[in-house]
Amino acid sequence: MTEILRIELVSVNPESLEKVSRMFKEIADKMGVRVKGPIPLPTKRLRVTALRNPSGEGTNRYDKYELRIHKRIIDIPNPDERYIRSIMGITLPDDVKISIVLM
């Protein structure tokens, strides 16, 4: 039975997300571990519309705010223990959240 190590990266900054996913892929290439990904998932957009004027008068008086959440998935079939230990030592930027699951 094959095990799959799934790494899910989430960030609002796409540049730092790409940098971290590149680091995971480079470590896997150095150790000779096979990697599937990074697979980009659809970007979630959180939108908030707020009325500028509290009195309610005026037509085009709205502020629109948007937050985009980017996700990447990296799958590693049959992960090596050395690879798992080496990715645990990576320092991540503050805006990148990571989830590691062994399936």
From Swiss-Prot:
Protein name: Small ribosomal subunit protein uS10
Native organism taxonomy: Archaea, Thermoproteota, Candidatus Korarchaeia, Candidatus Korarchaeales, Candidatus Korarchaeaceae
PROSITE patterns cross-referenced by the UniProt entry: RIBOSOMAL_S10
Quaternary structure, from the entry: Part of the 30S ribosomal subunit.
One Gene Ontology term, aspect cellular component: cytosolic small ribosomal subunit
Superkingdom, natural source: Archaea
Source species of the chain: Korarchaeum cryptofilum (strain OPF8)
SMART domains tied to this protein: Ribosomal_S10 (SM01403)
Keywords recorded for this protein, A-Z: Ribonucleoprotein, Ribosomal protein
Function: Involved in the binding of tRNA to the ribosomes.
SUPFAM superfamilies: Ribosomal protein S10
GO biological process: translation
